[in-house]
Amino acid sequence: WITPVVQNASGYDYHGYHASDFSKVDCRYQSGDGKKSGDVMFQELIDKAHAKGIKIILDIVLNHTGNFGEEHFCKEFDRDTRLRNQADINACMIPNLETLGSDYPGLQPGYQYQRRLAMMKNTDGQNHDTHNYWHHFGNFNWDLPNRWWAQIAGDCVDLNTENNTVADYLVKCYGNFIKMGVDGFRIDTSGHISRLTFCKQFIPQFAALGKQYEDKRLNKAPFFMYGEVCARFGSVQYRGQDNLSPYYYTWKAPKDLMDGFDGSQSYWDTQEIYDSGTGYDAKLMPLCEKDNADSPESNNTFMLNGAWHEPDYSQSSGFNVIDFPLHYNFSSAGSAYGLAKSGDMKYNDATFNVVYVDSHDYGPQPSDGIRFSGSDAQWAENLSLMFTFRGIPCLYYGSEVGFRRGSVIDKGPNGPLSNTGRAYFGGYITGDVEASDFGEYKASGNVEATLNHDLAQHLIRLNKIRQAVPALR
């Protein structure tokens, strides 16, 4: 997947997860001469990828905005897109003094942050967010359902996705990308939104748009959605709780809870909520926490008596997930395989799990803050399992050469990116590649050396095997 492309704003927003305007592509994606907007350039990317038989999976964020407001819900800034240096947040972001106050420019950075936050979630004891576009929840526990309502980081201000106005706006904005032809969504921080909310507010809506605009996608393939239900834990069930486990999101929510879900703006306008209080509204958040029934099981992933059988998707939510339990056990292929065999019946269909060894966030346990540190032989074994087992293989850039092996993935703003697992990989792929067939090519420049790496060659062979054997796909 490619990381989010909507307009961002923060002091650390290179990755796209701090939205300030969901309705447009970030101005930093405009053409070098400024004649083509980011939206036009992104459409060109989709079209050119499709012309080469490549699908575009777009990372989207439903859970939160950045901490600089949002153009539609709380306009705190104007952006000067004419400035070449868009990384200089103080120069390109012009504060809306009507919203932030005339004294805002003279405040120290920490107080400026608190002022911005107060306008979004009532942290100063005043009811600024009268329509409840954001959640106003204080302390939370990563291992309890109240993680659905809380701000998980200073630059990730939690949206009230139970509010129809918020959900409808997000569906409209991201629906525009479906109309442009993106082939699927990877949905960030899905584990910080309840399953009930997904089933009521997002999955059916995106699925309907996907069906409506199927002609825009490569080969009219079904629109694919999968979520990041983060579970940094060694078992398939997350700390004894079904409703916080990735597999739970692959199943439909109960009909009685769906029928009782009323996120109308007229309701939310009656709620006055502060994070110094309970942080809960009168009915929607408690209703979501009632979605905690035991999860069913399925044999959709398995053959029966050595034969294929028609899968039963009658209880599928239409949503798939990143296989966090498998990812977390990829310290060895044997450990990952054993875990999957013991737990795949918990997913509606684990065939659609997205599987990776490491990512831009985590590596396998026990040291999940670093990129996979194993040898090339260990990498090759893990990749062999990924490409010949159930699920959809996913590679983080550079894994094909063991790039930044063992490096700390995210040091925040405390050091250059070049010293982290998120370092720039572009230098490895400069040069030219001319493909004559699947896995057959001629290359020159740095990319030739990259493709000649032992792991890259192993991946080419695995891809050829997977392409030749339909059962593996």
What do the PLM-derived regions correspond to, one by one?
Residues 1-7, 136-142, 337-346, 350-353:
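Conserved oxyanion/phosphate-binding beta-strand-loop segments in alpha/beta enzyme cores
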Residues 2, 56-58, 185, 225-227, ...:
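Hydrophobic faces of well-ordered beta-strands that scaffold small-molecule active sites
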Residues 4-180, 201-212, 224-238, 243-319:
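Substrate-binding/active-site clefts of carbohydrate-active enzymes
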Residues 5, 60-61, 189-190, 358-359, ...:
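Short, well-ordered beta-to-alpha junction loops that form the rim of enzyme active sites
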Residues 5-6, 24-32, 383-394, 459-462:
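Domain-wide signal for the mature, well-folded portions of proteins, strongly enriched
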Residues 46, 50, 64, 172-179, ...:
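Active-site-proximal helices and loops of the catalytic beta/alpha 8
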Residues 155, 350-373:
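Active-site clefts of carbohydrate-active enzymes
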Residues 155, 355-357, 394-396, 402-403:
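Short hydrophobic-aromatic micro-motifs
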